[in-house]
UniProtKB/Swiss-Prot annotation:
Record carries keyword Transport: yes
The protein's name: Cytochrome c-551
The entry's keywords: Electron transport, Heme, Iron, Metal-binding, Transport
Ligand binding (heme c): C14, C17, H18, M55
Residue ranges with Polar residues bias: 1-14
UniProt-recorded Gene Ontology molecular function terms: electron transfer activity; heme binding; iron ion binding
Organism expressing this protein natively: Halorhodospira halochloris (Ectothiorhodospira halochloris)
Chain intervals for the UniProt region annotation (Disordered): 1-35
Amino acid sequence: DGQSIYESGTSPTCASCHDRGTAGAPKINEPGDWDGIDLDAEALVDSTMDGKGAMPAYDGRADRDEVKEAVEYMLSTIE
């Protein structure tokens, strides 16, 4: 499920940065951190696959469908 992928998927895991806000990553459970970010799941999956800022590109390292599950989990924590 999305939470498991978020916590223990491809390294570095989503949780390794988004739990603490490392390198400016918006934190889960903190809706204010996501202000100004396009919250469209597909747009966030694209950013994850391509890499953005300090976040490395996951294209070729992670399955797009699993990335989408993790993104949807993250979005569910800020609704």
